[in-house]
């Protein structure tokens, strides 16, 4: 690609990265919205996940022949395969809890809860002693305060609806029931959905920690992604066969919204991994994270257009708190990495001076 060869102007390079991130966030929210709509037409979650990840793995398969062919890679040992298998199991749990949570609630709630992942990762990193909290450092305080804000925001989104801030009118081409919970029997569904989406966040956080470990010992992003999607397809299909053992007809896919949703999910999943790896390589993980809160706004717009979703005050307040907490955690992580870099440079300076003195 010429744009990445260093010949293009900086603003064009930034435009490419910006467009890629907007495509990723819109696609991820879009598939959640499409899934929510398809469930009303009879889509079952287990065939949806099993077939989608199987097709995604087939789409990722060609990348294995063009990437990670370096001889410096360690052999794909049983230990590494078992860790990727565990990652696939965690991934299966997070997509199952996530999409069932969307069935009970809405893509807007899913997007809001998804943004507490950095806070949950920070908490788990402290529990596993991968992070240390120092009240004397601004970065630690920022991550701590951001975590608290994110968790408060999540509680507000789940437990407080409040009045409607925006009332969506049903589009003429969508004959669909109101998804935002009225203050009646649907409140319990909203709470169940929020609990499942929070569980999804925990699974994602543990997956991030395990994925970072796997990539440190086996830095082959596309190969790991391929094996991961295969594992998720196997695990979700196996669980589905057990859960739906008395209903085998759910595995028959018809040429309707069900097939469209499965194919779209597979394409989004495979493209997401490609753009994710490409962006992290060229811009770093922080750049990728900056765009996550946009998913809340995108979900609100898509929900209003396609699902007749209304926006409640609780979701608005909680979304703002989660976004502030998200950026506080990201700011703390960025400053922590900056401090570590400057500290390592200071350590190198005396060594260089000593070498010069020895040469003299």
UniProtKB/Swiss-Prot annotation:
Membrane topology of this protein: Multi-pass membrane protein
Membrane spanning stretches: 15-35, 45-65, 84-104, 108-128, 140-160, 190-210, 224-244, 248-268, 286-306, 311-331
Organism superkingdom: Eukaryota
Subcellular location: Membrane
Keywords assigned by UniProt, alphabetized: Membrane, Transmembrane, Transmembrane helix
Gene Ontology CC terms, in alphabetical order: membrane
Name of the protein described by the UniProt record: WAT1-related protein At3g28070
Native source organism of the sequence: Arabidopsis thaliana (Mouse-ear cress)
